[in-house]
Swiss-Prot record:
Chief localisation class: cytoplasm
EC supergroup of this enzyme: ligase
Protein's organism: Edwardsiella ictaluri (strain 93-146)
Binding positions for L-aspartate per the UniProt entry: E171, R217, H448, R489
Known EC number: 6.1.1.12
Residue runs in coiled coils: none
Identification of the protein by name: Aspartate--tRNA ligase
C-alpha cells in the first residue's frame, strides 16, 4: 500500500511519485489549497492538494485529525522561504493527486496538544502511542534490543529460552501464581527471574547464555516498578567477577555510543561501604558533587545529646553535608528539608550557615552553635571543606537512618540548587556488598539473592559470622540508577546449604523448594557468574524520560492494573470450578 515512510522523505526523493499511508496529524484549508501534515511511525511530512485534482481535493476537504488515509503524490522541494528547519522533512513537500480515505476517526478522548491524565493515556494507549515522542521511544527500545542481540551473538552467547511456568521459590518478592487444571490444588509460579534455570544451563555446559525475558514480581506499589518487566539476562561459566564486568561494561559502552553517540569511558569501581559512607546510597549519582562527611569523633563530648548520643553509639552515625552557596537558603527552605528527611526516619535537621569562614564562631549562624566550642567548630568546618557562603546540614541518628536521610537530602539539594550536572553520564560499578542484611524480624535476609556466593570464606566460617561476610556481587550504576546487578553464584552444595541455614530455611524446606538445585550441585558444577540488566530502565535513561511507563507499550498503573483491558478482572465461575478454586469474599466487598 505504501512506497515510502513519511518521515524518511528528503531532497533525494524530489521528482519521485510516492504512495504514503498514515494519519492526518493536522489539516489547514487555505481556500485555494488544502495542506495536511501526514504522520506515520517514522515522522511527519507536509502534503498539499489543489483544485485541479478534483477528487483528491474534495476528499481532502473532508479530512479531520487522525483520519487514516493513503496519499499518492509527487515529492517537490519547498521554496526556500517556506522551508521548515524544525521538521526533518521540512525541505520538501508532497503534491498530492490521489487520496483514499481508509478510515474515519471519531473525536479523540486524548488531546495531542495538551497534557493528558495518566489514567486516560493508559486507557487509550493505542492513541497515546501515536504521539511522535511515544513512537520514538518504542523505536529506540527496538533498536536497543536488536543491538544487544548482535553484541551478545558476536561474543559467543547463546539465546536460550527458559520456562514461564515454574516452581514458586523465595527470591525476595511475592510470586504470581497460576493454578494447574490437571494437577488439582497445585500452582505454577511466573518467574521473578530465570535465575535458577540459567544456573542449571551452566551446569548443562552452555557456558555463555543470554535471554531478553519477561519477569514477574507481585511487589508493593511503587511509582517506578511494574508487575511485569523485561531483563537482559546473562550467565557465564569459568569467568571471574572481573571478567563478567568487563564484558558487560563493554556492552554498556557500545550501547551508549550506538544510541547516544557518547563515550562513557572506563567505569570506576567503588565498594558498597565507600558508596554508603560518601554518598548515602548503594547507587550513587556521581554527577552530584556533594559528599557526606563523618564527624562523630569530633562531637563525642559536646553538650548536645542529639550529636553526642549517636556519636558514642557503635550503631550510630553523625554526618555533615556541606552545600556550596547554600547560605542563601531561607528558613522556609531549611524547614522543608527538615520535613523531607523525616520521610526517612530522621527526627530533625540541624544546620549551620557559614557567613565568614575566617571569623570562626562569629562567622557562623546556627541554632546549634552554642553547643559547640571553637575547637569542635573548626574541626567540622575544616573536615567538611566549608567556605564562606556555604551551609552545612547535619544528620545524627542510627547509622541506617542518618545515612538514608542524608543520602536522600544530598540528591534533593543537588537537584534543587542545580548542582547536579545533568549534561553528563556518570557510570560506575559498586562491589563488595554485605552478604546478608537484617530482615526486621530478628533474622537475616540475602542482600541480593540466596544463590550469591560469598567472597573467600568457608561454609563453616560463614555460619560462624554471617553478618561480616562480603558477597561476590556487583551492580552497574548509571546516574544514580541501578541498571544492572549480578554476582558470582554458589557452585558448592555445602555452601548453598549453609546459606539456606543462615536464612532460616530448614533442611526439609530446602529439599521441598530447592531439591533439584541441591541435586544438580552434586554433579560437577562449574564456577559461574552473571548479571541482569533492567531493559525498561535502560531504555528510560537512553530516551531521557523519568517515567518507566513511557518506554513500555502497554504498562500497568502503580496499582498494577491495566485501564485499557480492565485487567485484572473476575474469572468465569465455571473456569474457577474446573480449577478447584473458591473465591473467599472479604466482608464489605462486592465479590
Amino acid at each position: 500500500m505504501r512506497t515510502n515512510y513519511c518521515g524518511q522523505l528528503n531532497l533525494s526523493h524530489v521528482g519521485q511519485e510516492v504512495t504514503l499511508c498514515g494519519w492526518v496529524h493536522r489539516r489547514r484549508d487555505l481556500g485555494g489549497l488544502i495542506f495536511i501534515d501526514l504522520r506515520d511511525r517514522e515522522g511527519v511530512v507536509q502534503v498539499f492538494f489543489d483544485p485541479d485534482h478534483q477528487d483528491a481535493f474534495r476528499q481532502a476537504s473532508e479530512l479531520r485529525n487522525e483520519f487514516c488515509v493513503q496519499v499518492t503524490g509527487t515529492v517537490r522541494a519547498r521554496p526556500e522561504s517556506q522551508r521548515n528547519s524544525e521538521m526533518p522533512t521540512g525541505e520538501i513537500e508532497v503534491f498530492g493527486h490521489g487520496l483514499t480515505l481508509i478510515n474515519r476517526a471519531e473525536p479523540l478522548p486524548l488531546d495531542f496538544n495538551q497534557t493528558n491524565s495518566e489514567e486516560n493515556r493508559l486507557k487509550y494507549r493505542y492513541l497515546d502511542l501515536r504521539r511522535p515522542e511515544m513512537a520514538a521511544r518504542l523505536k529506540t527500545r527496538a533498536k536497543i534490543t536488536a543491538f544487544v542481540r548482535r553484541f551478545m551473538d558476536n561474543h559467543g552467547f547463546l539465546d536460550i529460552e527458559t520456562p514461564m511456568l515454574t516452581k514458586a521459590t523465595p527470591e525476595g518478592a511475592r510470586d504470581y501464581l497460576v493454578p494447574s487444571r490437571v494437577h488439582k490444588g497445585k500452582f505454577y509460579a511466573l518467574p521473578q527471574s530465570p535465575q535458577l534455570f540459567k544456573q542449571l544451563l551452566m551446569m548443562s555446559g552452555f557456558d555463555r547464555y543470554y535471554q531478553i525475558v519477561k519477569c514477574f514480581r507481585d511487589e508493593d506499589l511503587r511509582a517506578d516498578r511494574q508487575p511485569e518487566f523485561t531483563q537482559i539476562d546473562v550467565e557465564t561459566s569459568f569467568m571471574s567477577a572481573g571478567q563478567v564486568r568487563e564484558i558487560m561494561e563493554a556492552l554498556a559502552r557500545a550501547l551508549w555510543m550506538e544510541i547516544k553517540g557518547v563515550d562513557l569511558g572506563d567505569f570506576p569501581v567503588m565498594t558498597f561501604a565507600e558508596a554508603m559512607r560518601r554518598f548515602g546510597s548503594d547507587k550513587p549519582d556521581l554527577r552530584n558533587p556533594l559528599e557526606l562527611v563523618d564527624v562523630a569523633d569530633l562531637v563525642k563530648s559536646v553538650d548536645f545529646k542529639v550529636f553526642s548520643g549517636p556519636a558514642n553509639d557503635a550503631r550510630g552515625r553523625v554526618i555533615a553535608l556541606r552545600v556550596p552557596g547554600g547560605a542563601t537558603l531561607t528558613r522556609k527552605n531549611i524547614d522543608e528539608y527538615g520535613q523531607f528527611v523525616g520521610i526517612y526516619g530522621a527526627k530533625g535537621l540541624a544546620w549551620m550557615k557559614v557567613n565568614d569562614r575566617a571569623a570562626g564562631m562569629d562567622g557562623v549562624q546556627s541554632p546549634i552553635a552554642k553547643f559547640l566550642n571553637a575547637e569542635v567548630l573548626e574541626g567540622i568546618l575544616a573536615r567538611s571543606g566549608a567556605q564562606s557562603g556555604d551551609i552545612i546540614f547535619f544528620g545524627a541518628d542510627s547509622a541506617k537512618v542518618a545515612t538514608d536521610a542524608m543520602g536522600a537530602l544530598r540528591l534533593k539539594v543537588g537537584r534543587d540548587l542545580q548542582l547536579t550536572d545533568e549534561s553528563r553520564w556518570a557510570p560506575l560499578w559498586v562491589v563488595d556488598f554485605p552478604m546478608f542484611e537484617e530482615d526486621g524480624e530478628g533474622g537475616l535476609a540475602a542482600m541480593h539473592h540466596p544463590f550469591t556466593s560469598p567472597r573467600d570464606i568457608s561454609p563453616e566460617a560463614l555460619k560462624a559470622n554471617p553478618v561480616g561476610a562480603i558477597a561476590n556481587a556487583y551492580d552497574m550504576v548509571m546516574n544514580g540508577y541501578e541498571v544492572g546487578g549480578g554476582s558470582v553464584r554458589i557452585h558448592s552444595g555445602a555452601m548453598q546449604s549453609a546459606v539456606f541455614d543462615i536464612l532460616g530455611i530448614n533442611e526439609q524446606e530446602q529439599r521441598e523448594k530447592f531439591g533439584f538445585l541441591l541435586d544438580a550441585l552434586k554433579f560437577g558444577t562449574p564456577p559461574h557468574a552473571g548479571l541482569a540488566f533492567g531493559l525498561d530502565r535502560l531504555v528510560m535513561l537512553l530516551t531521557g524520560t523519568e517515567n518507566i511507563r513511557d518506554v513500555i507499550a502497554f504498562p500497568k498503573t502503580t496499582a498494577a492494573a491495566c485501564p485499557l483491558t480492565d485487567a485484572p478482572s473476575r474469572a468465569n465461575p465455571a473456569a474457577l470450578q474446573e480449577l478447584s478454586i473458591a473465591v473467599c469474599a472479604k466482608q464489605g466487598s462486592d465479590a
